Amino acid sequence: MFIMTKYFTSESVSAGHPDKIADQIADAILDAVLAQDPYARSAVEVTTSTGDVSIFGELSTSAYVNVRQIAMDTIREIGYNQAELGFTADSVNVSNRIVEQSGDIAQAVDSADDDPEQLGAGDQGMVFGYATNETDNYLPLTLALSHRLMRQIRDVREAGTLNYLRPDAKAEVSVELDDNNQVSRIAAVVLSTQHDETVTLDQLREDVRRLVIDPVLPQELVDDETIYYINPSGRFVLGGPQADSGLTGRKIIVDTYGGAAHHGGGAFSGKDATKVDRSAAYFARYVAKNLVAAGVADKLELQVAYAIGVAQPVSLNIETFGTAKIDEDKIRDITAQLFDFRPLAIINHLDLRRPIYKQTAAFGHFGRTDIDLPWEALDQVDKIKALM
């Protein structure tokens, strides 16, 4: 009988990837606005291309921020600060086409149709939260490793350890799964990184394997059959926005769960917390993570849907993929008893009117151990256990 080997793959990209540059600029603008006006409404979008950054979208605020300077500072911080990169902080043209938020949308959000004391959802739509006990940070191993590879290559570049590296990079990790869908081994690693013209491909591959990949991968999951693809296309000198255009919201799977869970389609960066695309997705992750950490299931996905101008969710669904340790009706009861999914309740519970967003715009919004994010807190575990 033929038995098909099962695999799962996730990817991540560096802070210097064109789409991530756009995300970071959008969230840097949002943070600057929130620092002056915590009640600002923001839906900022950014495009990046050869020598150009375009900023547009909607913003309603009493704050004044220098959008052009924020964009230039963000680009420089990422590492685009040398003329040979083509796209640089000092040479880029920044255009600002931000307009004020529609009054129709504003009035729908300011006072919910079903509860005037609450904020209405900023739009219709559904969001998903997910957690798995596969890793200590409750993310799929493939995504956790892909993010770590991107942070590691940033670190060796910024430290000057590999001074020929340039900011644009991508990583992808594939694992083999056993009959119980548990990770049995790492099957393949793909890592592509931009570099100077001076380095040979052989030298780059040797250095990246030794200083970037090997320190990150769990050695107990690596074997003689693990395949490494390091710059498999060969030369990668021209990169970043000089080679590819970038846009906010095009890395939503990298930002969330690496393909292990559903996605409602709404992106995060540039949006303030009245946008349930962002705030409710964060809260859904918070709920899922606390439920899994409390032991109700090995992995759990939560879907929440909203109507524009209405506070209470239209629907809430919980999926445990056959891993529940208690009755699923009990899980739903616990969730309803402990967690309030109305937008204003979410904003207040997670304290989301603060300038905390730029730090999330690269290397993932979830499972972060390098920064302190309120939706990653495990402060509801004891309450959940008491109700189990």
From Swiss-Prot:
Keywords: ATP-binding, Cobalt, Cytoplasm, Magnesium, Metal-binding, Nucleotide-binding, One-carbon metabolism, Potassium, Transferase
Listed Gene3D superfamilies: 3.30.300.10
Binding site for Mg(2+): E11
Leader sequence segment: none
Recorded GO CC terms: cytoplasm
Cofactor(s) for this UniProt protein: Mn(2+); Mg(2+); Co(2+); K(+)
GO molecular function terms listed in the Swiss-Prot or TrEMBL record: ATP binding; metal ion binding; methionine adenosyltransferase activity
Keyword Methyltransferase: no
EC number of this enzyme: 2.5.1.6
Cell compartment(s), UniProt: Cytoplasm
One Gene Ontology term from the biological process aspect of the record: one-carbon metabolic process
Reaction catalysis annotation: L-methionine + ATP + H2O = S-adenosyl-L-methionine + phosphate + diphosphate
Pfam families: S-AdoMet_synt_C, S-AdoMet_synt_M, S-AdoMet_synt_N
PROSITE patterns: ADOMET_SYNTHASE_1, ADOMET_SYNTHASE_2
SUPFAM superfamilies according to UniProt: S-adenosylmethionine synthetase
Binding, L-methionine: E58, Q101, D244, K275
Cofactor annotation comment: Binds 2 divalent ions per subunit. The metal ions interact primarily with the substrate. Can utilize magnesium, manganese or cobalt (in vitro).
Positions that bind K(+): E45
Residues reported to bind ATP: H17, D168, A169, K170, S233, G234, R235, F236, D244, R250, K251, A267, K271, K275
Presence of the UniProt keyword Glycosyltransferase in the record: no
Tissue/organ expression: Mostly in Roots.
Pathway(s) annotated for this protein in UniProt: Amino-acid biosynthesis; S-adenosyl-L-methionine biosynthesis; S-adenosyl-L-methionine from L-methionine: step 1/1
Subunit structure: Homotetramer.
Function: Catalyzes the formation of S-adenosylmethionine from methionine and ATP. The reaction comprises two steps that are both catalyzed by the same enzyme: formation of S-adenosylmethionine (AdoMet) and triphosphate, and subsequent hydrolysis of the triphosphate.
Family: Belongs to the AdoMet synthase family.
Protein name (Swiss-Prot/TrEMBL): S-adenosylmethionine synthase 1
Record lineage: Eukaryota, Viridiplantae, Streptophyta, Embryophyta, Tracheophyta
